[in-house]
Amino acid sequence: MATKFPKFSQALAQDPATRRIWYGIATAHDLEAHDGMTEENLYQKIFASHFGHLAVIFLWTAGNLFHVAWQGNFEKWVSNPLKVKPIAHAIWDPHFGESAIKAFSKGNTYPVNIAFSGVYQWWYTIGFRTNQELYLGSVGLLILASVLLFAGWLHLQPKFRPSLAWFKNNESRLNHHLSGLLGVSSLAWTGHIVHVAIPASRGVHVGWENFLTTPPHPAGLTPFYSGDWTVYAANPDSANHVYGTAEGAGTAILTFLGGFHPQTQSLWLSDIAHHQLAIAVVFIVAGHMYRTNFGIGHNMKEILDAHRPPGGRLGAGHTGLFETITNSLHMQLGLALACLGVATSLTAQHMYAITPYAFLSKDFTTEAALYTHHQYIAGFLMVGAFAHGAIFFVRDYDPELNKNNVLARMLEHKEAIISHLSWASLFLGFHTLGLYIHNDTVVAFGQPEKQILFEPLFAEYIQAASGKAVYEFNTLLSSSTSPATVAGNQIWLPGWLEAINNNKNDLFLKIGPGDFLVHHAIALGLHTTTLILVKGALDARGSKLMPDKKDFGYSFPCDGPGRGGTCDISAWDAFYLAMFWMLNTIGWVTFYWHWKHMTIWGGNPGQFDESSNYIMGWLRDYLWLNSSPLINGYNPFGMNNLSVWAWMFLFGHLIWATGFMFLISWRGYWQELIETLVWAHERTPLANLVRWRDKPVALSIVQARLVGLVHFTVGYVLTYAAFVIASTAGKYG
């Protein structure tokens, strides 16, 4: 008999029902649970998969480069970045029809998709200028992807499989990743900016043919060896520098100017190079801190074991954490996801507030798309961090090893943690909603002057302390006489104060009562999401109801009132609930960002300031008003180039709504439905010639919820993506 899927589980492969397929897919990545899996084999498989992951990333990037070089208009865009629309790729579709071909054709090009990903600005900033360079980059990445795939295969061969001891050698791995991965790669990137990108921004082409003969600075390496490093900061580009040409260009390569290049409204490349160099130095030093073969440096275990406050308030302190983290991949993954989630959210913020790429801040649709994209990814990563934290408690937590240390004490006072989060969420929820609906009511009854409007004083003070003069707080950097301001203008960031008080960029936007309210609405979402996730993780191993449910596993389902209390201790259900809260919270974040920016770009910030104080304002003046481009993608007079987003908007709603079919139902209904269909199938002539090997059974409760959640999530994100792109592109191109 042929072996059935899944090969990794004998028990599942022999299951006579369709469960075999779904459980097989569900546990394909749960490597720990596979037949015959040893700890060493587990580490080796995960390690090899990293090479595959990198290969996929490089392949994808190579695809972007290749398609833009082949079907895009990069060279034309480079000649006039503000007026030419960047093309992502051609659209090949015989079903188009005449009106669509007209709508999607730009000039004399065949129907195309416009790029809203920011790759044009990115490649331009780092020194690309021609299609040939894009092709070369694409081929280079393909070769790299092939090398990585080979490396992944190689590390699965018996001779080249690293041992378990190698994987658990924390100090060596830290040194290698800090110095090698983060330090040297930052140094290499600094080198690229200094040797290729900065010359390109000054009209000097540096390629493979001349990079060894074109010094990035006229003084060469002499100042470096003589210690006269200020030479590299002298003579920066002037304020009237025309980007990409020698006009107004300087010679500085490592500066501390602050603010933005007046023409491109992006950070000075020489500032970025300086920043990247500093990071390289810090990480290369950090990568020499830990004790490995030479008997010098720190030992992680000693540091953790020594962290025990003298007052005794933290019990055994960090004792046991070294072994706990070393031996738990879920704990490591949880920490990594949490850090990466925060970094991704910061990327969303900094990508528009301190734009690193030339002319990106003039491409409003791309800015909106990038913000939304990074914010959603951050949400998924952070929820994943807590999910793996919960799996850690179920599978990897050893109460003996962690006796009376900080981890055990967290678990012992979890009620206090959970209830404090609960109080914070309740306070934020009732007060914020109360203010909104009060304002809604008085506006609806024609008395808008009775709204309760708070000026965000503390936030304004923080902005003023950073140099924003409009609030007239006259404190720290917004006071012309403070020592910080005096030093700032002479030594560091002379361009900062000009930038923060310039209305042409996104640094510290002016805020008011609408911002105050939505800030607290977002705080409510963040606290509630955190509450659900923290409770799910802390109660994952057990609660008052069931002291230790280690053997029940992570996907222990919430079985409703029939089995009282099971919902209280299901980590899977906490993850499931938190996903909805996370998605809705990021909805509020992106609505806020998008609406505020739409009004600023349109020169009418007053619309946001007035309408954002009550919920009807959000529904009417943001969602409804901005959905007109989507509704008019098709109309009685034909169609326009937003029709594709109109389709996506409808399709997103459809997927989203399908999710509810799985979310608002119960298992018995599905089983009955399936058996009815099977009965009908078996009695229908011709149809009953087709048989199946597996007995059809309904999805389990947990599976149906997952299917529902996936539809809800995908539909939600697709719908909002279409809305953001079409509403912004409809107004601002």
From Swiss-Prot:
Its EC number is 1.97.1.12. PROSITE patterns: PHOTOSYSTEM_I_PSAAB. The chain crosses the membrane at residues 46-69, 134-157, 174-198, 272-290, 329-352, 368-394, 416-438, 516-534, 574-595, 642-664, 706-726. GO terms for cellular component: chloroplast thylakoid membrane; photosystem I. The keyword Iron applies. Gene3D superfamilies: Photosystem I PsaA/PsaB. The keyword Electron transport applies. It is found in: Plastid, Chloroplast thylakoid membrane. GO terms for molecular function: 4 iron, 4 sulfur cluster binding; chlorophyll binding; electron transfer activity; magnesium ion binding; oxidoreductase activity. Chlorophyll a B3 binds at M661, Y669. [4Fe-4S] cluster binds at C558, C567. It is a multi-pass membrane protein. Chlorophyll a B1 binds at H653. Disulfide bonds: none annotated. It comes from the Eukaryota. InterPro entries: PSI_PsaA/B, PSI_PsaA/B_CS, PSI_PsaA/B_sf, PSI_PsaB. Phylloquinone binds at W670. Keywords: 4Fe-4S, Chlorophyll, Chloroplast, Chromophore, Electron transport, Iron, Iron-sulfur, Magnesium, Membrane, Metal-binding, Oxidoreductase, Photosynthesis, Photosystem I, Plastid, Thylakoid, Transmembrane, Transmembrane helix, Transport. Pfam families: PsaA_PsaB. P700 is a chlorophyll a/chlorophyll a' dimer, A0 is one or more chlorophyll a, A1 is one or both phylloquinones and FX is a shared 4Fe-4S iron-sulfur center. Belongs to the PsaA/PsaB family. PsaA and PsaB bind P700, the primary electron donor of photosystem I (PSI), as well as the electron acceptors A0, A1 and FX. PSI is a plastocyanin/cytochrome c6-ferredoxin oxidoreductase, converting photonic excitation into a charge separation, which transfers an electron from the donor P700 chlorophyll pair to the spectroscopically characterized acceptors A0, A1, FX, FA and FB in turn. Oxidized P700 is reduced on the lumenal side of the thylakoid membrane by plastocyanin or cytochrome c6. HAMAP family: PSI_PsaB (MF_00482). PANTHER family: OUTER MEMBRANE PROTEIN, OMPA-RELATED (PTHR30128), PHOTOSYSTEM I P700 CHLOROPHYLL A APOPROTEIN A1-RELATED (PTHR30128:SF19). The PsaA/B heterodimer binds the P700 chlorophyll special pair and subsequent electron acceptors. PSI consists of a core antenna complex that captures photons, and an electron transfer chain that converts photonic excitation into a charge separation. The eukaryotic PSI reaction center is composed of at least 11 subunits. This is Photosystem I P700 chlorophyll a apoprotein A2. The gene is psaB.
